[in-house]
Amino acid sequence: VGQWKRPWYFKKEESESMHQAVQRESKLTRQTAGIIDGSTLGKIEIKGKDALEFINLMYTNAFTKMKPMTSRYVLMLGEDGMIMDDGIICKINDKHFIATTTSSGAPKVLSHMEEFLQTEWPHLQVFLNSITEQFTTFNISGPKAREIISKVFTDIDFSNEKFPFMTFKIFDYKNTQARIMRASFTGELG
């Protein structure tokens, strides 16, 4: 995926076909939980006094009323008006955002943003930084995902009231800054 290598599936037995393995993994994820290494997803840090205005111009969504420490699914259009990429925007504050992109889309999204900053909105004070390689990403899905993750991050309350859908938290985990987001790509609670 992009410049990353990622397994397609894991065989349980040598005789198991790719189709059988994927069906087994999908069924188990829907019944219990599954994990995927999503580190290949692009991550772009957007900072500066005009960061909010910039993302309002770059994406199809409106971000003016978005609260800090919340996330939103986003679409980026190309100059032809067609969907160029999708991802999630995480708002730390009005001057600091993290944008995720598709795995193969990160370079073109960053280039697209930089081009518009230089040619269309050079007056905006915005700084972009690719942070894809700085963060490992794991997606844990399925009905037992919260139960599993609660055993790892025991200081975080994962209840709906304390950790609403499409919010995220930044915290220290074993002397390392970590981010955890509640989102859903498969239709469960997130």
Q: Residue ranges of each PLM-predicted region?
A:
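Glycine/proline-enriched, intrinsically flexible loops and inter-domain linkers
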Residues: 1-190
